[in-house]
Amino acid sequence: LNWSVKAIAEATKTKKMAGVNWQWNPVSKLWYFLKTDKDRFSTLCQGTGAYICDMWIEATIQICMERYGKPPALCGQFHDEMVLRSKDTPKARQIMEGIVQEAIERVNALVQMNTTLGCDVAFGKTYADIH
């Protein structure tokens, strides 16, 4: 595993601008601040994960806007999770799960990675119930 981490890190595109190092992320198409060269792999992984999560949340919002003319009740976002509020009925749960799953499908179409991204949906009254 260590050889692959090093190989992936070395394959990333970097540049120095105004004395600051930057790393290109081919998934997000963004340049990320690179504190040290040893951070290349983690910058790539964390930047990609944050971008995918942000796009997933954005797709969820877009779907709700398209269907209902308003965004979902987004209560929180933590690392790779989003917390939404909805009615506590079987129909509302089914609809919300469908929206969240469709949103990750849209992200898959956008990023076109060599693996299919997925997500789990959990329902509950507290964060402990859904985490």
Give the positions of each predicted feature.
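Conserved catalytic core of nucleotide polymerization and phosphodiester-bond processing enzymes
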Residues: L1-H131
